[in-house]
Regions:
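Accessory terminal and edge-of-domain segments that mediate assembly/interaction
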Residues: 1-142
Length: 142
């Protein structure tokens, strides 16, 4: 599927709240985002750059009709889409918050897919490795 390069994440989860209040944004480091974009473009891979929703419940998104708060989940996802969210996952916001607290760079790249098989993760892995190599090279030249 198409790659999602995440610039920031909606903090729709609880873990990151144990590090800093919810008012603090969960954002990727711009150098990591740039390196991921450059790598995906160099490999000729379809990709989108944007915001992700980080959530606590996998099945709340995949099967909201089996929840006691079905309409709330559907309404919230619709709001995130209207705001420009391109994907949903369960880790990025906490990763970005912890990276901010530790003053280290972090980014996120995911494979977007809907129904059916996910397919190979090789393009994602190769893109991430190429981006990390670019970051290392940039650090060595700085």
């Amino acid at each position: 599927g198409e790659l999602a390069i995440v610039t920031g994440a909606i903090r729709d989860e609880g873990t990151s709240l144990h590090y800093i209040p919810a008012d603090f944004p969960a954002v990727a480091h711009y150098e990591v985002v740039q390196a991921l974009r450059k790598a995906a473009t160099a490999k000729g891979l379809a990709h989108r750059v944007g915001i992700s929703q980080s959530k606590d419940s996998f099945y709340g998104e995949v099967e909201p009709e089996h929840s006691g708060v079905t309409q709330r989940l559907l309404d919230r996802w619709k709001a995130w889409e209207i705001g420009g969210a391109i994907c949903s996952e369960m880790e990025a916001s906490t990763l970005f918050i912890v990276a901010s607290m530790l003053r280290v760079r972090a980014g996120g790249i995911m494979v977007m897919h809907g129904e059916g098989e996910l397919g190979s993760l090789e393009p994602l892995i190769e893109t991430a490795v190429l981006a990390v190599r670019e970051l290392i090279k940039g650090d060595q030249n700085a």
